Every structure is written in structure tokens, then in C-alpha cells.
């Protein structure tokens, strides 16, 4: 059964590629252009997973997931970072903020889907 997944990335091409991959796997996809924009999806969307970039304008991925984790309904929803960032310090900061996993761009669609299967029940 498909899951409801929010993709947050300031790159339209990344949003479209990820969306295409997930929709072809049977998932329902919502898209936000940055953390600030994506906050609107937290009320009433019943998300199963959030996939977010780290570096975005207006509100970056770390600040975004801190906002997500502050909502009672989203304290345990998995959050994957999909980013070009590979620094260990950033990964630790993301984990401390509430990230579930980390995927480096460019990504292989099959590996993205496998990562999703690991974190979404």
C-alpha cells in the first residue's frame, strides 16, 4: 500500500525526479519548495514520511525538522535527508534534530526506495 510522502527541496528538478520515482512506486506525493513552504503540509496531511534537502532558502532542513518534531503528530514520522552534503558534523546535527536517515545526491532510485522501505512501516 502506498504511503503519503512529503518532498521538500528548493530544486524543481529534484522534486520532480523524486516525485516521479515515488509515484511510480505507488506513493502519494506532496511537494514543498523549502522548509517554510512545507510547514503548511503538517496540518491534516497525515504524512507517513518526509524527505528533505538540507540547504534551502527561507528555512533550511535542520530548522524544518525541528519544527516538524515540535508537533505531537510528527514526533515519530520518519524524516530522510536527501542532500549533497556529506560532512559528518552535519549528519550528526541532523540526527540530533530528529532525522531518521541520510541519502546523498545524486541518488539511485532503487536505493531511495530501499531506504524508504527500511524506515516506513
Label each residue range with its predicted role:
Residues 107-116:
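C-terminal output helix
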Amino acid at each position: 500500500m502506498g504511503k503519503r510522502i512529503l518532498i521538500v527541496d528548493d530544486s524543481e528538478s529534484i522534486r520532480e525526479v523524486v516525485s516521479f520515482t515515488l509515484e511510480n512506486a505507488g506513493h502519494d506525493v506532496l511537494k514543498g519548495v523549502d522548509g517554510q513552504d512545507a510547514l503548511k503540509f503538517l496540518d491534516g496531511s497525515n504524512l507517513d514520511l518526509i524527505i528533505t534537502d538540507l540547504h534551502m532558502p527561507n528555512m533550511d532542513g535542520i530548522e524544518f525538522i525541528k519544527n516538524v518534531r515540535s508537533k505531537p503528530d510528527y514526533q515519530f514520522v520518519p524524516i530522510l535527508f536527501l542532500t549533497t552534503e556529506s560532512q559528518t558534523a552535519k549528519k550528526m546535527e541532523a540526527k540530533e534534530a530528529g532525522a531518521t536517515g541520510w541519502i546523498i545526491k545524486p541518488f539511485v532510485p532503487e536505493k531511495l526506495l530501499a531506504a524508504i522501505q527500511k524506515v516506513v512501516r
